[in-house]
């Protein structure tokens, strides 16, 4: 796959609160404070900085300045540093992160490229499945489709998908749906409508998943948006192409 071309989206969302409860990130994420530094904490260890790159899979809480922060989820990338929790981005990486969160698709592409040195190339057939799953969360890509696309028996196909993307097939589908719903809510969509559009069983199902993966409940996130006028930061970029969603 050529440099800069990836099937993975980079989802940008506002964080309109001053604290996130304990939760693990599903994928690698860049947090950028709007006014002052951010602190992430886990098991007595903390990392503070204006822009932080947070390791996925580690349960952590977050303290933010009074204006909150923004986050870009770098889907498909492996955390490239040895730090157990997070690293503060400085210099050009910090500038790229700020530009990316501001809506600069070229900056998002370059940021991904500079952080991709620990990520293996994605097999072309897995990329096809990833594109299909991210394009429309209402389209239930099945294990049978995965098996046919990869031309492997089921167990091997599921292992191949996890090894290639870093997530199980089921978790990748759930995470893709959650990002879609979060983007809708960031543009002031009703929770029940966002849940339906993203394929969740009901509002309660979306609320449980949202809380466990983001560290706050949807109602708190939406209430926080009412106190800020930065909701237009919510975007979903497919790097290497035009933005798929610009929700401004």
Predicted features and spans:
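Terminal helix-turn-helix DNA-binding modules in bacterial transcription factors
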Residues: 163-201, 224-248
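Helix-turn-helix/homeodomain-like alpha-helical modules used for DNA recognition
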Residues: 14-22, 205-224, 235, 239-248
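Basic/polar phosphate-binding segments, predominantly the helix-turn-helix DNA-binding elements
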Residues: 144-173, 195-220
């Amino acid at each position: 796959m050529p440099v800069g071309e990836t099937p993975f989206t980079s989802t940008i969302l506002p964080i309109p609160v001053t604290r996130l409860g304990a939760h693990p990130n599903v994928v690698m994420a860049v947090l950028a404070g709007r006014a002052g530094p951010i602190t992430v904490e886990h098991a007595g260890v903390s990392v503070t900085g204006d822009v932080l790159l947070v390791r996925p899979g580690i349960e952590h809480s977050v303290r933010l300045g009074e204006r909150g922060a923004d986050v870009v989820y770098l889907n498909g990338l492996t955390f490239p540093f040895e730090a157990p929790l997070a690293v503060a981005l400085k210099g050009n990486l910090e500038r790229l992160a700020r530009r990316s969160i501001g809506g600069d698709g070229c900056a998002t592409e370059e940021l991904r490229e500079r952080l991709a040195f620990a990520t293996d190339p994605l097999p072309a057939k897995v990329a096809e499945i990833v594109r299909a799953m991210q394009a429309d969360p209402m389209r239930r890509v099945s294990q049978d489709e995965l098996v046919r696309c990869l031309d492997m028996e089921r167990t091997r196909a599921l292992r191949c998908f996890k090894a290639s993307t870093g997530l199980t097939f089921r978790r990748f589908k759930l995470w893709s749906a959650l990002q879609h719903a979060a983007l809708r809510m960031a543009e002031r969509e009703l929770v029940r409508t966002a849940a339906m559009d993203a394929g969740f069983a009901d509002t309660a199902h979306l609320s449980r998943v949202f809380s466990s993966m983001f560290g706050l409940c949807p109602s708190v996130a939406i209430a926080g948006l009412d106190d800020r006028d930065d909701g237009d930061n919510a975007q979903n970029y497919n790097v290497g192409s035009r933005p798929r969603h610009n929700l401004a």
